[in-house]
């Protein structure tokens, strides 16, 4: 039977990872290693300055752990190299994240980082996120569409094989809409996220300042002369966005121009 490792950045008890497990439990043998506490926007952080403690969850056949103060990258690293080192995983899936991970957010994202760590460890990996809107943050959220998408995607991978070669992963974003409103899937490039420079300054009872970094509205810049919808555009039209991501961040188009610019200094 196929074996899938799940993680997230919302924490072991988050609704998204439970929905993910429910969606896949009849398709594969599921293992879960997730942070004990929320680690949103922790990026590819891995813990090397403090010990990590792994708590085995009772009643889960020894396949569930939560990592005290661990990040998604910690969780995947520990799962593959120690906790389940005798298990050959077919997939690592990180999610279902509560909120989008598109454009430059993929660099900040702990969810995407979990899938990146799986890729680094040589396992085909997927990050999946459920878009939220301001109006529904405090209302019940349905994962029906996200569950359907991940089931279809995993089944396709099990049938056809993983579609990417080398150090690459899939980043999936699911729109905040019903199955009836859903318009299909699009293979997309990353868009350009627009950020506001918000910092919220507050004063505590001791009259000392503290700060909250601003939560930015989901705004983006339209790509010019682009035949494909970006991930943002796809979501805005109730499409699921599937984006291939490459761990190699080298800007190959600029290598020659940089050599020319640096001419005379290179030895």
UniProtKB/Swiss-Prot annotation:
Cellular compartment(s) = Cytoplasm
Record-listed E.C. numbers: 3.1.3.5
GO molecular function terms noted in the UniProt entry:
3'-nucleotidase activity; 5'-nucleotidase activity; exopolyphosphatase activity; metal ion binding; nucleotide binding
The alphabetical list of record keywords is:
Cytoplasm, Hydrolase, Metal-binding, Nucleotide-binding
Q: Which InterPro entries does the UniProt record give? A: SurE (IPR030048), SurE-like_Pase/nucleotidase (IPR002828), SurE-like_sf (IPR036523)
UniProt entry tagged with the keyword Cytoplasm = yes
Q: Which residues bind a divalent metal cation?
A: 9-10, 40, 97
Cofactors named for this entry: a divalent metal cation
One Pfam short name: SurE
List the record's Gene Ontology CC terms alphabetically.
cytoplasm
Q: Does the keyword Nucleotide-binding apply?
A: yes
Q: Which reaction does it catalyse?
A: a ribonucleoside 5'-phosphate + H2O = a ribonucleoside + phosphate
> Which domain of life does the UniProt lineage start with?
Bacteria
What is the UniProt remark on how the cofactor binds and its stoichiometry? Binds 1 divalent metal cation per subunit.
Q: What does this protein do?
A: Nucleotidase that shows phosphatase activity on nucleoside 5'-monophosphates.
Family indicated by similarity: Belongs to the SurE nucleotidase family.
Q: What is this protein called?
A: 5'-nucleotidase SurE
- This protein's species is Helicobacter pylori (strain HPAG1)
Its gene is: surE
């Amino acid at each position: 039977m196929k074996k899938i490792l799940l993680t997230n950045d919302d924490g072991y008890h988050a609704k998204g990872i439970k929905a993910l497990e429910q969606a896949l439990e009849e398709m594969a043998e599921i293992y879960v290693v997730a942070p004990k506490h929320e680690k949103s926007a922790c990026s590819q952080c891995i813990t090397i300055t403090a010990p990590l403690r792994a708590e085995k969850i009772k009643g889960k056949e020894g396949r569930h752990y939560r990592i005290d103060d661990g990040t998604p990258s910690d969780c995947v690293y520990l799962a593959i190299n120690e906790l389940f080192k005798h298990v050959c995983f077919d997939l690592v899936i990180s999610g279902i994240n509560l909120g989008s991970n598109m454009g430059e957010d993929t660099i900040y994202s702990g969810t995407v980082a979990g899938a990146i760590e799986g890729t680094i460890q040589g396992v085909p990996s997927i990050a999946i996120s459920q878009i939220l809107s301001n109006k529904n943050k405090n209302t019940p959220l349905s994962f029906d569409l996200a569950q359907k998408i991940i089931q279809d995607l995993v089944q396709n991978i099990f049938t056809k094989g993983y579609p990417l070669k080398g150090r690459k992963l899939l980043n999936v974003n699911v729109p905040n809409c019903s199955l009836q409103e859903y318009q299909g899937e699009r293979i997309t490039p990353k868009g350009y996220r627009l950020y506001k420079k918000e910092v919220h300054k507050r004063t505590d009872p001791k009259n000392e300042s503290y700060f909250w970094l601003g939560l930015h509205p989901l705004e983006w810049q339209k790509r010019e002369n682009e035949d494909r919808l970006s991930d943002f555009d796809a979501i805005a039209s109730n499409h699921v966005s599937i984006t291939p991501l490459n761990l190699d961040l080298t800007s190959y188009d600029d290598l020659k121009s940089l050599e020319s610019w640096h001419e005379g200094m290179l030895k």
